[in-house]
């Protein structure tokens, strides 16, 4: 890093934007290259334009958004595409599937505005009666939640489909979800463990059971 970096800037950069995807901690030059090529990939951008962008970033005369600084060009960018670069989305509560989409987008790190006006919620199906979603601590459950964003979203999809479409009860297990505090490589941070997921499903079940038949 350049000597002109303040101590606070160094701490913030190391803590928030310097990635360690391949076993080596990025320095600022590494981050600049990752972000540049993550943004220009597939575009008709000249070497002169890339050099100009590199100059402005190295001298910190111009910066991408913080989300782009962390995510652009990372392995998870290759896997997920540009959705995780967005800060916010807007959805309407006119289908149960939109609640699954909302959770997926939230787990990408953005904010989701969900309109629950009656003109939208009145389009939701009636809640099926006598649906029971049971959490088990074994691998004998009907659905084993995988240790991934996709696994959590699939569980929510199954729960809502049971209450709004099939009326079928089922059990699920979180034995494969990593324990609380373990690192998350793709987006950084640490795992919350399965407890918030179990609590969420329990709360959703309670709300929908109170509305069964309506």
Where do the protein language model's features map onto the residues?
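Extended catalytic cores of very large enzyme megasubunits
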Residues: 1-214
